[in-house]
């Protein structure tokens, strides 16, 4: 008879413990009900990104000395640098520079180690395309000036949002 009573007591204790755990989880869920939604309607609204964000790489053709440091420090040997040696002036002349953003991991090593600062990270992150070959940017596409996200009219709705000010 005694083992039966202790069995009922253990069962009762386990039931109370389970109810307490369920109640704690439910209280956490209820604490989130009075918060504002976090969802951003992406094509129409955008968040302001950090100033350290690693977006599309901007390239300045005139500053590049074709030293290929960017290729050596890239973990996947991605930048393609074509150059020609000008023998009469003993310098390299850059012919072509391209980066395939379909393969790029945006580590920023090329930007950090460039001795002439001809590479810089922008805040552009929209690379959507139907053909992956369109992600291979040459020096003309890389030289295009980036559009500032702050000047975009869709940002203003997020800037005035109460959840950005409060949280």
UniProtKB/Swiss-Prot annotation:
Keyword Metal-binding included in the entry's annotation: yes
Gene3D superfamilies this protein is in?
3.30.70.3270
By its UniProt entry, which PROSITE patterns does this protein fall under?
A: 4FE4S_FER_1 (PS00198), 4FE4S_FER_2 (PS51379)
Q: Which Pfam families match?
A: Fer4
- UniProt GO MF annotations: 4 iron, 4 sulfur cluster binding; iron ion binding; NADH dehydrogenase (ubiquinone) activity; quinone binding
What are the binding positions for [4Fe-4S] cluster 1 in this chain?
A: 64, 67, 70, 114
One cellular component (GO) term of this entry: chloroplast thylakoid membrane
Membrane topology is: Peripheral membrane protein
Name this polypeptide is given: NAD(P)H-quinone oxidoreductase subunit I, chloroplastic
Q: Which organism is it from?
A: Aethionema grandiflorum
What lineage is this protein's organism placed in?
Eukaryota, Viridiplantae, Streptophyta, Embryophyta, Tracheophyta
